[in-house]
């Protein structure tokens, strides 16, 4: 049996040169990185203040 291979290309009629979409994508990546850092800082604060309670609550919810 012969297998048919299809090469997918993205975007359709768009140009390959980065433009406004590239700048918007960069801004989005920076915003996501900033939000992730803020969330990790918040988790660190909770663990520093109350690590034992955090672990106890995690185990009660089914964590291992």
Swiss-Prot record:
One of its GO terms (molecular function) is protein tag activity. Residues 1-37 are annotated as: Disordered. Residues 24-52 form a coiled coil. Residues 1-11 have a biased composition (Basic and acidic residues). The modification Deamidated glutamine is found at residue 64. Keywords: Coiled coil, Isopeptide bond, Ubl conjugation pathway. It comes from the Bacteria. Residues 21-58 are annotated as: ARC ATPase binding. There is a cross-link at residue 64 (Isoglutamyl lysine isopeptide (Gln-Lys) (interchain with K-? in acceptor proteins)). Is modified by deamidation of its C-terminal glutamine to glutamate by the deamidase Dop, a prerequisite to the subsequent pupylation process. Pathway: Protein degradation; proteasomal Pup-dependent pathway. Protein modifier that is covalently attached to lysine residues of substrate proteins, thereby targeting them for proteasomal degradation. The tagging system is termed pupylation. Belongs to the prokaryotic ubiquitin-like protein family. The N-terminal unstructured half of Pup provides a signal required to initiate unfolding and degradation by the proteasome but is not needed for pupylation, while the C-terminal helical half of Pup interacts with ARC to target proteins to the proteasome. NCBIfam families: pupylate_cterm (TIGR03687). Strongly interacts with the proteasome-associated ATPase ARC through a hydrophobic interface; the interacting region of Pup lies in its C-terminal half. There is one Pup binding site per ARC hexamer ring. This is Prokaryotic ubiquitin-like protein Pup. It comes from Rhodococcus jostii (strain RHA1). The gene is pup.
């Amino acid at each position: 049996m012969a297998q048919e291979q299809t090469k997918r290309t993205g975007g359709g009629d768009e140009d390959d040169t980065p433009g406004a979409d590239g700048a918007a994508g960069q801004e989005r990546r920076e915003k996501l990185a900033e939000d992730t850092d803020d969330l990790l800082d918040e988790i660190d604060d909770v663990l520093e203040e109350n690590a034992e309670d955090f672990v106890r609550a995690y185990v009660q919810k089914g964590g291992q």
